[in-house]
Regions:
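N-terminal helical cap/lid subdomain that shapes the substrate entry/recognition surface
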Residues: 2-93, 102, 113-115
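Substrate-recognition element of Asp-dependent hydrolases with the DxDx(T/V) motif
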Residues: 25, 95-122, 134
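Substrate-recognition "cap/lid" segment bordering the active-site pocket of phosphatases
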Residues: 84-87, 113-140
Length: 140
């Protein structure tokens, strides 16, 4: 069987974004006068997106009157610090080169918003054949 395309998740698979997402959440918590959370507790949640981080950090559900505002603030902090410590996992750049050399298309399917995905890939100088994000399609 010949494989001509491979799709990957982004956060926690290709790119270690946990440090910058953790930084964004803890910055927001500290600005709100709350105690920062440990990286070890935040790290498993990053794959579930910013809303999961707000639920964890503030103990809010999505019906809380400040949930949307806090989520937007988190995204703003993250946007401004998206490449502070995020980096490809070991071997990812070599893997991308192998795929290109073998003329295998590759892409990303992620729950991360499109504007953040493209910004992160640009900052890390990663060129990809196709990207499908959490807000790319009508249903995610």
């Amino acid at each position: 069987m010949y494989i001509n395309t491979i799709l990957f998740d982004l956060d926690g698979t290709l790119i270690d974004t946990a440090p910058d997402l953790s930084y964004a959440l803890n910055t927001l918590l500290e600005e709100a006068g709350l105690e920062a959370k440990s990286f070890e507790k935040i790290k498993p949640l990053v794959a579930f997106g910013g809303k999961a981080l707000i639920k964890f950090g503030f103990n809010y559900d999505e019906e809380h009157p400040e949930f949307f505002k806090r989520h937007q603030e988190l995204l703003e902090i993250y946007t401004n610090n998206i490449d502070l410590n995020s980096k490809p996992f070991e071997g990812v750049i070599a893997l991308i080169k192998i795929l290109k050399d073998r003329q295998i298309n590759w892409g990303i399917v992620t729950n991360k918003p499109e504007y953040l995905t493209h910004l992160l890939l640009q900052k890390l100088n990663i060129n990809v054949d196709v990207v499908v994000c959490g807000d790319t399609l009508e249903f995610s």
